[in-house]
Amino acid sequence: MCRWEQEEFWRLSNEGAAMKIQNIPFEVTDWSQMTLVEHEGERGTSQWRTFDRGNIRVRMVEYLPGFYSDHWCSRGHVLLVLDGELVIQLRDGREFVMKPGTSFQAEDDEANPHLAFTDKGAKVFIVD
């Protein structure tokens, strides 16, 4: 990449489209050292390891086989599937089968929230 391309990349990266992360100095997270907290779904269990600082929450979540969420979620997320298979259902009836390497990005949406379920189990990385 030439100097002009680098400058253009950084200019575009720093304009309004970038996520605004505040009050979080550089920090490395060893997820294996984060406290594991279990959350019961309508059926099954999910296991969360959570980094919650500044204005963001970052989670490594494992949905155990047979998990079905106990609520519709209207909070915005970026979710990346690392392992397994997770189904995201929108209240409008659409379903999306998420496999390793796929992600979804969604804004806060009271009108069309989502929920998650899995037959096989899944491990995901979530930022919200």
Placement of each model-derived feature along the sequence:
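Short beta-strand segments in beta-sandwich/barrel cores
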Residues: 68-69, 85-89, 103
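Ligand-binding loop in jelly-roll beta-barrel domains
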Residues: 108-128
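A short, N-terminal "cap"/entry segment at the start of jelly-roll beta-barrel domains
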Residues: 2, 7-59
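Conserved short histidine dyad/triad with adjacent acidic residue
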Residues: 57-73, 108-109
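Short acidic-glycine-tyrosine-enriched beta hairpin
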Residues: 92-109
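Short, conserved beta-strand element in jelly-roll/cupin
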Residues: 73-88
